[in-house]
A protein has these predicted regions:
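N-terminal juxtamembrane/topogenic regions of multi-pass membrane proteins
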Residues: 9-86, 217, 229-234, 249-279
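Intrinsic-disorder-associated, low-complexity terminal segments enriched in Asp/Asn/His/Tyr and depleted
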Residues: 3-5
Length: 279
């Protein structure tokens, strides 16, 4: 019974740690800056009695549209990366299996197996690294090309053509994956989006004060025939302004994490180790 309790506590602790990691993965220094700006903006609005019924459509265009656009683009890049990596791995596996059933010597079959592993290993190293040096990757791909040229005599004419097509798919998959790593979503849109997220609390605080009531006047709730009840909405205004800013900057952080789906920064990044596994 004691062991069962210990197992339960360990499982509960692991679950809580995973949940904590899950919900804090999008938090960084921008989150703190955004929260501080929200508090300052709300304090400023109360300090100078700023209370306006402002139209939020303008700020929606400035913040929500570019945020949704860049977030959608980042997820599309991730899906494309999965597609290109899958194509490259599948084509490499097909090349290896074609030679494994050919009349090539066992030594050559072992060599193509090692070269396929080398290409996958070098591709993963390159995508994970911050460097743009792909010389080792290019050499490993060239080795497979040279191997095919050297051993095509063991394949029929039609099979040789198919192998070269598979090699083309390998190169296309690798190059497209490299392009996704090097080229990001439009940086100007992301820069303006971040700027407007920081400006938004100064625009939103006076609107909240106008809609929820000034601290000096109170906010009417539960009005009945017998009378009304009032309470101070200062805390509510502060909380709502912080919450909306927190949501916006968290979405921005998520977009930044999946901007490069290969760097391992974020829960939604591609697990490249899976592409090194053999069928």
């Amino acid at each position: 019974k004691i062991d069962n309790n210990r197992i339960f506590l360990v499982c509960l602790l692991i679950f809580m740690l995973n949940m904590f990691k899950k919900y804090t993965s999008a938090l960084n220094f921008r989150t703190l800056i955004s929260v501080i700006i929200s508090l300052i903006a709300t304090w400023t609005a109360y300090k100078y009695n700023l209370s306006f019924n402002l139209d939020l459509t303008l700020i929606s265009i400035a913040v929500v549209f570019p945020l949704v656009f860049t977030l959608g683009s980042a997820f599309q890049r991730r899906e494309k990366a999965l597609e290109h990596l899958g194509r490259a791995k599948g084509s490499l596996a097909a090349i290896k299996y074609i030679f494994s059933v050919s009349k090539a010597p066992d030594v050559e079959k072992k060599r193509i197996d090692d070269q396929v592993k080398e290409v996958k290993s070098e591709l993963i190293k390159y995508l994970y690294s911050e460097s743009n040096d792909k010389e080792a990757l290019n050499i490993s791909i060239s080795n497979i090309k040279l191997f095919i040229d050297k051993n095509k005599e063991f394949l029929g004419r039609s099979i040789s053509v198919r192998v070269y097509r598979l090699m083309r798919d390998v190169i296309m998959g690798v190059e497209n994956s490299i392009s996704i790593k090097l080229h990001r979503t439009p940086q100007t849109i992301r820069a303006y989006c971040e700027l407007f997220i920081y400006i938004f609390p100064f625009y939103y605080a006076p609107t909240l004060i106008y809609n929820l009531g000034n601290a000096a006047l109170g906010f009417e709730i539960g009005a009945t025939a017998g009378g009304s009840e009032y309470f101070d909405t200062t805390f509510l205004v502060y909380a709502l302004n912080v919450i909306i800013s927190f949501i916006l900057i968290s979405l921005y952080n998520v977009q930044e994490q999946i901007e490069n789906p290969f760097d391992g920064d974020g829960m939604d990044d591609i697990q490249l180790e899976n592409y090194e596994l053999e069928y």
